[in-house]
């Protein structure tokens, strides 16, 4: 039966071939030949080429003009006119061979040149050596690292802490460890560059609210709430984060934490608090903006800070609940893929914590000096003070811009240079202008430390005022 059926099909095919129109057969034949040609032909043609003559080669070489390896840079660019520091940048700093009072370094508690920190670091150096030569997960965890994490957790009154070997990488690693693609982040417009890099790495949906404007933040939260109601299934798996600084690097202002906590619970969001400037500065015991406002540490989901300011060491830390911190040990890129903090720096940070706990009055002294310099800098012709009176890092901006950022920078740099000639070391706030999301105006940064005397503060204010009148008027 099968053979008969096959013969019948063959007969039908031959009959259909005879009955088909001629143009149909021609078209099918052309297509079959084209397919055969494609199967057996090469995917490319060898182009016929003729070698250039010696004369033609010489002409091409003569005409060729190489592009510059780097873009042209003016001779007065800051990168080509750097200052050379000799010795530790403590209360007095030697810049380009000239001794000045240091109003530029974030040595808020004056611990950078402290003998106790030096002794602790030296003892650790003799015991452990210089570095660890490995990340925390690969034989880079020393007992001093665990001691420091335990001390930080107890000092901040949290369940657990984790340390990073580089301050900038701390918040830049913590953000993408939790916030992923599809999550929503509400961030302050004045957020520092480290937060910006963390947001970029997270690939989350970023919503920016005006600086310290809680009405604008609530507007964005309400808009998101309306969007969530349209798609409840998606809303259930979408996480919402509010990321702010305790004391803003770019403005010297304190975040309104009580209002932020209210919005957190009202709209079911998580708060990440970056406290690199406020840790060791604000609060009765230097615990930061939570202690400053009397807010429970449990109301904040994650706190991050570097140890390069008040603790006069290197690296950074995050603290919070244990399940939050443990997640970073496998997901924090700066923790997993960087060599761990050198033990000598961890030992120095522990000793700095000891000093902070032994002498809590140091924070009141710093606060009082911040208020004095803030008041003394008011009313300088041509300059305005940006920042709160309790901030140890203030900004001096031009009252009226020239309309050109480059000219503004040059004017402020001239003030910095002349102040340095008179024994006051200042610095401009520097930014990667092409990478900043919202570029702050040019400014001179004035940093207050506990080591500065009343005479130092008065001298700095009077020097800045005199130089500003000379340069700007």
Swiss-Prot record:
UniProt keyword terms in alphabetical order: Acyltransferase, Endoplasmic reticulum, Lipid metabolism, Membrane, Phosphoprotein, Pyridoxal phosphate, Sphingolipid metabolism, Transferase, Transmembrane, Transmembrane helix
Cytoplasmic side: 37-473
Pathways involved: Lipid metabolism; sphingolipid metabolism
Gene3D superfamilies xref list: Aspartate Aminotransferase, domain 1 (3.90.1150.10), Type I PLP-dependent aspartate aminotransferase-like (Major domain) (3.40.640.10)
Cellular compartments per GO CC: endoplasmic reticulum; endoplasmic reticulum membrane; serine palmitoyltransferase complex
Regulation: SPT complex catalytic activity is negatively regulated by ORMDL proteins, including ORMDL3, in the presence of ceramides. This mechanism allows to maintain ceramide levels at sufficient concentrations for the production of complex sphingolipids, but which prevents the accumulation of ceramides to levels that trigger apoptosis.
Gene Ontology molecular function: any one: pyridoxal phosphate binding
Role, per record: Component of the serine palmitoyltransferase multisubunit enzyme (SPT) that catalyzes the initial and rate-limiting step in sphingolipid biosynthesis by condensing L-serine and activated acyl-CoA (most commonly palmitoyl-CoA) to form long-chain bases. The SPT complex is also composed of SPTLC2 or SPTLC3 and SPTSSA or SPTSSB. Within this complex, the heterodimer with SPTLC2 or SPTLC3 forms the catalytic core. The composition of the serine palmitoyltransferase (SPT) complex determines the substrate preference.
Protein name: Serine palmitoyltransferase 1
